[in-house]
Amino acid sequence: MLEEVVTILMYVIAFLTLYITIFYLLLTIEKKDEIKEKAAGVYTPPITVIIPCYNEEGVITKTVSVLMKSDYPKKNLKVFLVDDGSTDNTFQEMKTLEKKYKGNVKAFSKKNGGKSSAINYGIMRARTELIATLDSDSYVHVKSLKKMTSFFKDSTVMAATSAIKVYKPKKIIEKVQHVEYLLTIVSRRLLSFLDSVTVTPGPLSVFRRSVFKKVGLFDETSLLEDQEIAYRIQAHNYKIVSSLNASVWTEVPRTFKALIRQRVRWNRGGLRNYWKYKKILSPRYGDFGVIIFPLGLIGSIAVLAVFFISLVSLLNGSAFQFFQYGFKVFYYGFNALQVISLIIFTLSVLWIWVASKHLKEKMNPISIALYLVFYSFLITIFWIVTIGEELSFRKQRW
Amino acid sequence: MVVKKVKRKISLNIHITTLIITLLIFIVGVFIGVQIASQTTSQIQKQLNQMEENNYNLQLLTLINTSSYPSTVLCETLEKGVESFEQQTFNMGSNLQFLESKYGSNDPSVTSLKIEYSTLEARDFLLLQKINEECGNPFFTVGYFYSNENCSSCGEQGDYLTAFRRQHSNVMVYSFDMDLKNQSFEIALLSSLYNVSSTPTIIANGKVLTGLQNVQQLNSYYS
């Protein structure tokens, strides 16, 4: 009985995975001309870039210097550095930057209250039409701000996301994330055509200030504030667009432990956000409600289901069949599920190939192979740690 | 300022196209998978047929009158034949065990292959008794009656027999699935011939041993 249930579950997961892979592939082919951004004309209204900081001594100077090289008209550019009660010399460094870029950069200091509270502090003091949020360890391309603000010529656009890339990937763990980030740029661009962008990422996103009046400020209790605000904007049916070319480079975890910590925070925050916005799971929200929003949750459940099935097969010994039966496991053991898995794998590789055509940056084939082979294992590990932490009620900070 | 909201819609066209393509690929995938699986069974069936032919050839050899033919030459040929046949039987047993774990013991094609295999083993077992008689007991024969359903110590017994077989090159082990007793004439015949009523039961060179026998006990009957 259990065997049959597991088999049916595996086929359901295989069918859904195949569906999503083909859906993305067709969407990429259908929108192949729209993916490339056409210049919508220059639009450079006053903008405030808010950079929340917590113990960023030695990092913030570089971030601000790179930002100030931007081709955005300086008379319309304000930079708010908000120190969230750092215990190092971050605020002194900010003051130096304030002096250096007088008239553009302003330093604020507040009591520690978390990343969202620092962003909100800045939003409440900003008077410009547009507001950007920039992580303190992210470096903006000279043309990116202009590219992103041009979206706001369309009065219906409430937020725009950037093309986040990994800053100088050297180690294998960074190179694998590099592939992941590049593919996310294309998939997020595709999602914007379905009005289904699920996150306005911390590294760089631009908002129309009025959206905060309509939906409220960043949630200071959320573990994943950049996703929470995006869900809230979507829940109010406002438009979020996504850029393919407005690059921003960000520092990513360089160790396996740091990567786990980051992804577990994303997972835990994500779960809370799902629960908070469960009303989106409805045809009233179109493609977002019926496919993109549930996809994240179904995907996570599928990852865990595959993990537990593998664990069971490991415990009952069938995973060790190779040692007992040798190569006949492969040539006698090939069944329908493996054929479908092979098709899904081939289509995924095809999608990566099609998606990479839209990117200016080249991806190393070895990194792609590593990404394809190891990423599912990594995602499983992230989810197991997430469950462990959820069950032990461990608190998490930004 | 009134801000225009997004008009939500479900992209039906792309969903319908996706669903059709997914269904098509899924069906083709399942079809290919089933084809591969059936090819596997037909390939094993071919191997079984080949083994049946080998077994038949050995049977023919035993019919030769030893008085008109030098018995040492005949016995050498028979012994070589039995040894290579035993290796094939062992591989086939492992193949079927794998198929059983893959498709389940209730799969009809697996059951049919198993019956055919058990029949062949039973014939080989009987043939070996005859060769032992003719050629001065060159082999130590073990008939092992087991059950997958009603026998908690059969797994352990299987491991002991594998270890025992490894220790002695002339030990020939033949396993008989008692769950197939009603479907295989040969298994029914052998079990009634040796009065086998429970599992595990071992026929060690003609001696009936009921219950679990460890390697030490098996060795005591070997000498």
What is the role of each PLM region?
Chain B
Residues Q183-T199:
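Short, intrinsically disordered low-complexity segments
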Residues L161, S197-N214:
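A short, hydrophobic beta-strand/beta-hairpin element that forms part of a small beta-sheet core
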Residues S152-Q167:
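Typically the conserved alpha-helix immediately C-terminal to a functionally engaged Cys/Sec
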Residues G143-S147, S169-F185:
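Thiol-based oxidoreductase modules, predominantly thioredoxin-like and allied folds used
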Residues N132-Y146, S153-E156:
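Coiled-coil termination/hinge junctions
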Residues N214-S223:
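Thiol-/selenol-based redox modules, centered on thioredoxin-like
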Residues F125, R166-S169, S223:
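Sec-exported extracytoplasmic/periplasmic mature domains
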Residues M1-F140:
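Non-globular targeting/processing and membrane-anchoring segments
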